[in-house]
A protein has these predicted regions:
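C-terminal segment of N-terminal export signals and the immediately downstream linker at the start
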Residues: 22-71, 270
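PLP-dependent enzyme catalytic core of the Aspartate aminotransferase-like
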Residues: 338-342, 350-383
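N-terminal export signals
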Residues: 1-28
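Active-site pre-lysine segment of PLP-dependent enzymes
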Residues: 144, 162-171, 183-206, 210-243
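Conserved PLP-binding catalytic core of the aspartate aminotransferase-like
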Residues: 155-157, 299, 308-342
Length: 383
């Protein structure tokens, strides 16, 4: 069916208005499992650590309002977003770089700071990438494409980054620390991370990925953005894909010293953040309920899910994110496939932990669907 732009705007505007009329903005929407042709009718999608409650009503309204300026490049709107981010993070405008999701930030970091080590009249370029194992794999891919050496350091017994061993493994280049970590949802304690950043060599960039920052409530966790001005080799990545519910819009950012930002900007495409993403991100930052309610709903449903798994005899790594990782007591690859055949999509295999399953925390009805399917499967084929 073909619809005009006017009709499309009317439909989206009606949806935003309906959302705004509901209590607690978008995060108080129905908790039923989705049955939408755009996502797959009846598919319970618990595989990508998305926010099932979606963007805030203010973000939806801002997107609708931005339709008439879709003919314009996003420079002014992007600058307005950077201004807000700089103020929120107590840094200068030139210390923020927007990205097409935080994924673009990770790629830029790999492009600039990793690769075969070469020395010319401008100095030494390239370097190795040091990461925890397991962790989010995207930056490993980018570094390998660049021809860089990738050094994997296993997580410690608490599923935190083993920072002492990572420090020993450092070679000029880049260290990537995802905190809270994906896929384990675990944190690296704040004092250990502060000490690591202070000890890291000047010729090595420390990239801390704080995609799941808003979900972390442990007293042993803190953002390292306040340390950026003290450490020229520190950069921090953030995203609007998680608690802000904008995974499909693609908007993220980096906080670092201005000299680092300029090196990244040289490799970046112009206007990589579209105008809808920019206005929606700015509106999201002005909606305190989005974060507050998102954290509350995630915490409630996560606690329910962990308790049910514990009742079944499956132990979960303590989670500080919008997903969990638990010991399935058997190889997860067959479980992933069998769950998919029952319309439940869970996280992929992480080879360093072949018996552990990563599971996004969806709405309660979605988690009940997962638990029902999982109970049936493990009853048929016990470990």
């Amino acid at each position: 069916m073909n619809i005009s732009r006017r009709e499309f705007a009317r439909l989206l505007g009606a949806g935003a208005a309906a959302t705004a009329a509901r209590p607690a903005l978008s995060l108080a929407r129905s908790t039923g499992a989705p049955a939408n042709s755009l996502t797959g009718a009846g598919l319970v999608r618990l595989s990508s650590n998305e926010n099932p409650y979606g963007p805030s009503a203010r973000a939806l309204e801002s997107m609708t309002s931005s339709f008439p300026i879709a003919c314009r490049y996003p420079d002014k709107n992007a600058d307005a977003l950077v201004d807000v981010l700089a103020e929120l993070n107590a840094v200068e405008h030139g210390q923020i770089l927007l990205g097409d999701g935080s994924g673009e930030i990770l790629k830029l970091a790999a492009d600039v700071f990793t690769g075969p080590v070469e020395t010319d009249h401008e100095g030494t370029k390239g370097g190795a990438l040091v990461v925890g194992d397991p962790t989010f794999e995207a930056i490993l891919h980018h570094a390998k494409v660049n021809g860089a050496e990738v050094v994997k350091v296993p997580l410690n017994a608490s599923f935190a980054h083993d920072l002492d061993k990572m420090l020993t493994a450092i070679k000029a280049g880049l260290v990537y620390i995802c905190n809270p970590n994906n896929p384990t949802a675990s944190i690296t304690p704040k004092k250990q991370l502060r000490d690591f950043i202070a000890k890291a060599p000047d010729d090595t960039i420390v990239l801390v990925d704080e995609a799941y920052h808003h979900y972390a409530d442990s007293p042993d966790y803190e953002s390292v953005i306040p340390l950026v001005n003290e450490h020229p080799n520190l950069m921090v990545a953030r995203t609007f894909s998680k608690v802000y519910g904008m995974a499909g819009l693609r908007c993220g950012y980096c906080v670092a010293q201005s000299s680092t930002i300029e090196r990244l900007r040289e490799r970046q495409s112009w206007d990589s953040v579209n105008i809808m993403a920019a206005v929606a991100a700015k509106a999201s930052l002005e909606d305190a309920d989005q974060v507050r309610n998102g954290r509350r709903l995630n915490s409630e449903v996560r606690a329910f899910t962990v308790a049910e798994l514990d009742r079944m005899g499956f132990q979960t790594i303590p989670s500080q994110a919008n997903f969990i990782m638990f010991d399935a007591k058997r190889p997860v690859v067959p479980l992933i496939a069998t769950l998919k055949s029952r319309q439940v999509e869970v996280g992929r295999l992480f080879p360093a932990m072949p018996n552990y399953m990563r599971l996004t925390i969806g709405k309660k009805a979605e988690m009940e669907s997962f638990l029902a399917a999982f109970r049936q499967i493990v009853a048929i084929a016990p470990a």
